[in-house]
A protein has these predicted regions:
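Conserved strand-to-loop turn within each blade of WD40 beta-propeller repeats
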Residues: 5, 27-31, 68-72, 80, ...
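A conserved positional marker within WD40/Gbeta-like beta-propeller blades
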Residues: 5-7, 33-35, 52, 65, ...
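WD40-repeat beta-propellers
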Residues: 11, 34-38, 58, 75-80, ...
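Loop/turn segments within WD40 beta-propeller blades
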Residues: 12-22, 52, 58-64, 81-82, ...
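C-terminal or late-domain output modules
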Residues: 149, 154, 158-215
C-alpha cells in the first residue's frame, strides 16, 4: 500500500464501534498528508491535506473525527466520512509531537473487566460493536478530550468535537514533550519529556497532580 511521498510517521485504526469490519485506518506522513486506507480494497480512499509541514501524530476518535498533529504547530480536526476539515486547534508555539484521547482505552475491541470479557464473542462482531459503543458513550457523555504535547515544553487539553479554544494550557516541563497518555478511566494524563521527568495531570481540567524527576 503506497501513496505517501515521504516516510510515514503514524497509524490509527477506525474505532471498532464505528466499523466492526475493521476495514479502514489512517496514516500520516512527513509529506504533510493524512491518507485513509481500505484494507479490503488495498487502496487509499481519501487524502486529507491542509498541514504545511510533517504530520507527527494522528488519532481516529470515537465520534468519527480524525485528529492530526503537525510540525506546522497546529492540530487539525477532520470528518472521516468525507474528509472535510472541521477546525484547526492553535496554541502551541513549536512542533506538536504527540496526541492522546481520553477514550483510547474505551475504544479497544475488548473491555478490561472480566464481566465484559466474558460477554465478548468473536463470532458476533455486530453485538461486540454495540458493546463497544456503549463503553465509549459511558466514557465520554460530554465528548472525548484530546491532549497534545509539544516541542514548546507545554501540553494543551482540548474538547475537540466542539471547541477551538483549549480547556487548559499545562506548563511545568523544562524540555520538549515526546509522549502523552490518558489513564484507562480518563481521569489522569501522564506526560513524558526530554527533561527526564514524568508529570501527572488532572484529565478533566489539566491541573498538575504529581511530578517525578530524577535527583
Amino acid at each position: 500500500m503506497r501513496g505517501h511521498k515521504q516516510w510515514i510517521t503514524a497509524l490509527s485504526w477506525e474505532p471498532f464501534h464505528l466499523n466492526y469490519q475493521c476495514r479502514r485506518f489512517a496514516s500520516s506522513g512527513k509529506d504533510g498528508a493524512i491518507r485513509v486506507w481500505d484494507v479490503i480494497l488495498s487502496q487509499c480512499v481519501r487524502v486529507l491535506t491542509s498541514h504545511t509541514r510533517s504530520v507527527t501524530s494522528i488519532r481516529w476518535g470515537g465520534a468519527g473525527l480524525i485528529y492530526s498533529a503537525s510540525q506546522d504547530r497546529t492540530i487539525k480536526v477532520w470528518r472521516a466520512s468525507d474528509g472535510v476539515m472541521c477546525r484547526t486547534l492553535d496554541g502551541h508555539a513549536h512542533w506538536v509531537n504527540t496526541l492522546a484521547l481520553s477514550t483510547d482505552y474505551a475504544m479497544r475491541v475488548e473491555a478490561t473487566s472480566h464481566y465484559d470479557r466474558a460477554k465478548f464473542d468473536p463470532s458476533k462482531p455486530e453485538e461486540n460493536a454495540k458493546q463497544a459503543l456503549a463503553r465509549y458513550q459511558a466514557m465520554c457523555p460530554d465528548g472525548e478530550k484530546l491532549v497534545s504535547g509539544s516541542d514548546d515544553f507545554t501540553l494543551f487539553l482540548w474538547n475537540p468535537e466542539k471547541e477551538k479554544k483549549s480547556i487548559a494550557r499545562m506548563t511545568g516541563h523544562q524540555q520538549l514533550i515526546n509522549c502523552v497518555e490518558f489513564s484507562p478511566d480518563g481521569r489522569i494524563i501522564a506526560s513524558a519529556s526530554f527533561d527526564k521527568s514524568i508529570k501527572l495531570w488532572d484529565g478533566r481540567i489539566g491541573n498538575v497532580e504529581y511530578e517525578d524527576q530524577e535527583d
